[in-house]
Every structure is written in structure tokens, then in C-alpha cells.
Design a protein with these regions (language model features):
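Charged, alpha-helix-forming regions
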Residues: 1-151, 156-228
Length: 228
């Protein structure tokens, strides 16, 4: 994974095929979460013990360790042209705090918040889903030079918003509520895995790696926007 750099008319970043597919999958899952209204978590956002990744061979550029982490997350990457709304998976009550973070109340007063929810949540949900799917489309079929992921000038806020929503979901799953918790997640992401690592620990390490990976990539975009 390479950070963003300025390019003609925008910004570009070169990613391995599996990295693009994986990030697109995270975006798709958040979009699915926004659209869900029943029970049963999206792949990869569940607590662990999923069916696992059924692929027998790693994708191009994907290491055996990367594949093991994705298998622990029960991750199934989307294909080009597939939208989040094409295969909805409903969200269980356990993910209610995540949805509340993505679609916050318009008021601290419970009665006012309930009254405003119908007016504010639907437009916000639509906005977030639209930008998530736009970013996902570029990741699956990049338009930059030599297959690089491209952000056209003027679309930066759309990308930052979409990436931030995914980070927010991952942070909630990791219980990150401050700098210390973020540092702990970073340490989990890069610590050497014990030989007897159980499924729960592997799942948490996978989510931590995802959070770390996405944070670094987003920060590379912010840095190039601020300093060139």
C-alpha cells in the first residue's frame, strides 16, 4: 500500500489488488449496515466464529498471513458493479451503538431526537451510502494511471467522509474511546501472533489491522492535501 500523492487533476495511490478489494469490502459492509433493519451482522463486523473465507488460493499480492486474518473476519470481497444494496444483511441489536454513531441523534433531548429522526436520518443515511458506494466503485475499478486509485480534485471531502465512517465503525468494534485505546489497538495490530491464538483474538487483531491500515491511508490523503 502506497500513500496518496498529487497527480494531474487530483490525487492517486497505488494498492495491491487484494488491498483494494479488502478496503472496498469494508466500505460495502458499512453501507450494508446503514441499510439494514433486521437481525444478523454483515460479514467481518460480526464478533467472530464466522464461516470463514472459502478461497483455497490467496489473491494477487496477498500473503498467507493476510489471508489468515481475512479468513478470521469471514471476509468476502465484493466484485465490480456490485452495490451494497444488492445483497442486504440486517444488523443485530448488538450493532445498534455503531448505527447510532453513524447516524447520531439531532438532539440530546430524547423526545426531540425521536421526532427529528425521521427528518434527519434518511437524508444522512442516503448521503453516507452514496459516498461509500462511490469510493467502493473506484477501489474495484481504479481510474488512475497504471491502475492507481484516483481521487478527482474536488471529491476529497467525499472520500474523507467515507473513510472516516468506516474508521468509526471499526473503532466502535474495538471499543476505541480515546488515545490510549487507539494505541492499544495499534499494538494488537502489529504484535507477533502467538501460536495458540484463539479465534476471538485473531478476529480482534484483524479488526485492529484494518483500523490501522485505513487510518494510515486516510492520514496520507490528509497530509498531501495540507502540504502537497
Amino acid at each position: 500500500m502506497h500513500g496518496f500523492a498529487e497527480a494531474s487533476g487530483g490525487w492517486e495511490s497505488r494498492l495491491e489488488t487484494w488491498e483494494r478489494e479488502y478496503l472496498a469490502g469494508l466500505l460495502e459492509q458499512v453501507a450494508m449496515l446503514l441499510a439494514a433493519d433486521g437481525s444478523g451482522p454483515p460479514n467481518g463486523l460480526q464478533d467472530a466464529h464466522g464461516a470463514g473465507d472459502s478461497r483455497s488460493e490467496p489473491r494477487l499480492g496477498e500473503s498467507a498471513q493476510d489471508r489468515a486474518v481475512l479468513a478470521a473476519l469471514d471476509f468476502d470481497p465484493p466484485g465490480p458493479g456490485r452495490s451494497a444494496s444488492s445483497s442486504l444483511t440486517a444488523a443485530p441489536p448488538a450493532l445498534a451503538p455503531v448505527i447510532d454513531a453513524l447516524l447520531p441523534d439531532a438532539s440530546e433531548d430524547p423526545e426531540v431526537a425521536l421526532e427529528m429522526a425521521g427528518l434527519t436520518r434518511s437524508p444522512l443515511r442516503a448521503l453516507k451510502q452514496e459516498r461509500l458506494e462511490a469510493v467502493m466503485a473506484e477501489l474495484l475499478e481504479p481510474t488512475g494511471v497504471g491502475g492507481a486509485v484516483r481521487i478527482a480534485r474536488g471529491h476529497e471531502q467525499k472520500w474523507l467522509g467515507a473513510l472516516n465512517d468506516v474508521r468509526l465503525v471499526l473503532a466502535k468494534r474495538l471499543d476505541i474511546d480515546g488515545p490510549e485505546a487507539a494505541e492499544e489497538a495499534h499494538a494488537i495490530a502489529w504484535e507477533e501472533a502467538p501460536e495458540d491464538e484463539d479465534e476471538d483474538a485473531l478476529w480482534r487483531r484483524g479488526i485492529a489491522l484494518s483500523y490501522d491500515m485505513l487510518t494510515w491511508w486516510q492520514e496520507s490523503l490528509v497530509t498531501v492535501l495540507l502540504y502537497g
